[in-house]
Amino acid sequence: MTFGEYIEEKRKSKKITLRGLAEKLGIAPSYMSDIEKGKRNPNRKELIDNIAKVLNLTQEEHNELYDLSAQQNENDISVDLTEYIMNDKVARTALRTARDFNATEEEWNAFIQTLKGNR
């Protein structure tokens, strides 16, 4: 599923028209249409956050929106992660170490559970 298809699906499930969503976001309906058709990709965090807010997405759905946006722009990192990664040397080191040692999904899940358990 593409970024635009995901937005369209969520918008329709909430019974919001394309024009209605565009108005709530303060953008032109033609721009919103281009986003849904995959002709344009709003990789600005603010717009993605506003889309998630207007569509009342869960945190998991919001994260999926970030990831789909990054996938549409090949080689991009999700806009919600870019600033964090670039401002945290340890995060960059951890990611590079995981890459170099080919960390498995199981290892990543164990790491996530360890972090959650410490909170």
Residues of each region from the PLM?
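Interfacial/linker helices and their anchor residues that mediate assembly or domain coupling
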Residues: 70-119
